[in-house]
């Protein structure tokens, strides 16, 4: 793994007090807002039209809270116990499984054309993107095989298991270069990026696995592909989707595919603005190769994902230890707000991002 060329800020106190640990655990527990909201929705279904739509207010509230969020630049202690923060990830994994099970059950037992189905599609998709995939991203960077396995399961539940191979051995090696399909170019709009990055990342994952097996150019019918993780992921994720259709009906299948689509759209929207317009110089990664945000709400709701510069410098560093980097360019909003800008206000998105690149003399202004 490449390391940063610029010295990163020092940590806070060498050892956190029990009170500080409890404070951080409580703050990071904000990540349960979306999955617990989805759980509440499923457990109280069926709803009337207005009652169902009211559950989407959690997404609106999250957007407003993120937009109004104060900055968080405090550095973590050098030593924090791992188990309380790891427990948060395991609980997120469990909630994702439970919520998806309840989604399928609801689709199998209720009229598909109720407002509940639309809200379930949106709410579960948002939860899968902001909770399931975020937990998967953290777990796939851990060394323990069982944690990596949990990450692959979570990605398979949104029909995107190949992301595991591409992200670790593709994106983290090629970030900010023309060879990285997950890095957005200067001036690129999200819709164009999405159409480019999805097939590019799949091709990258396929080639990386083929290379691991001995031949990057092996044909599709090569028996060695039976050992490809990408092939395993395709078989398992689509096998599960087909089984859901057969056992629970077409309505459950449609909602399953629908929540996966929303989740992947969110994932790639985050990928879009995390490196938009940045051009890496040289073989080593530095803090200026990723966009950060100081949003307090994003930091704790998305388990540290927003400290992206430090993550790329030290990919195995657990989320509670990630540091704020003054050198990295700063997003004009938190992640929830940035998704809105990228999807609904592309001209404003480009204007604000370009201004920051000019101010820091990064990207095409270097």
Walk through the language-model features, giving the residues of each:
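Juxtamembrane membrane-interface segments at transmembrane alpha-helix termini
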Residues: 63-73, 131-138, 161-164, 266-275
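Intramembrane catalytic core of multi-pass membrane enzymes that act on lipidic substrates
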Residues: 76-198
């Amino acid at each position: 793994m490449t390391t940063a060329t610029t010295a990163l800020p020092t940590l806070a106190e060498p050892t956190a007090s029990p009170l500080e640990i409890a404070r951080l655990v409580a703050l990071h527990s904000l990540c349960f807002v979306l999955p617990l909201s989805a759980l509440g929705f499923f457990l109280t279904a069926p709803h009337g039209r207005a009652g169902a739509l009211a559950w989407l207010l959690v997404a609106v509230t999250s957007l407003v809270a993120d937009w109004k969020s104060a900055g968080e630049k405090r550095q973590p202690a050098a030593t924090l116990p791992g188990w309380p923060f790891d427990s948060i990830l395991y609980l997120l994994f469990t909630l994702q499984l439970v919520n998806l099970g309840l989604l399928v059950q609801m689709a199998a037992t209720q009229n598909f054309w109720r407002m509940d189905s639309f809200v379930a599609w949106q709410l579960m998709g948002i939860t899968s993107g902001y909770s399931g995939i975020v937990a998967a991203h953290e777990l796939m960077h851990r060394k323990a095989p069982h944690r990596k396995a949990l990450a692959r399961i979570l990605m398979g539940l949104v029909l995107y298991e190949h992301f595991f191979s591409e992200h670790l051995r593709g994106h983290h090696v090629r970030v900010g270069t023309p060879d990285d399909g997950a890095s957005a170019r200067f001036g690129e709009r999200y819709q164009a990026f999405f159409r480019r990055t999805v097939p590019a990342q799949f091709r990258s994952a396929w080639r990386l696995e083929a290379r691991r097996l001995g031949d990057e150019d092996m044909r599709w019918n090569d028996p060695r592909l039976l050992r490809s993780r990408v092939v395993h992921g395709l078989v398992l994720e689509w096998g599960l989707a087909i089984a859901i259709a057969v056992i629970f009906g077409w309505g459950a299948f449609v909602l399953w595919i629908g929540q996966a689509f929303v989740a992947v759209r969110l994932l790639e929207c985050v990928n879009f603005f995390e490196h938009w317009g940045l051009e890496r110089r040289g073989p080593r990664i530095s803090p200026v190769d990723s966009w950060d945000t100081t949003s307090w709400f994003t930091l704790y709701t998305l388990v540290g994902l927003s400290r992206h510069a430090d993550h790329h410098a030290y990919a195995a560093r657990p989320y509670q230890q990630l540091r704020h980097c003054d050198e990295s360019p700063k997003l004009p909003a938190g992640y929830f707000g940035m998704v809105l800008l990228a999807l609904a206000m592309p001209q404003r998105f480009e204007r604000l991002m370009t201004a920051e690149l000019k101010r820091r003399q990064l990207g095409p202004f270097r």
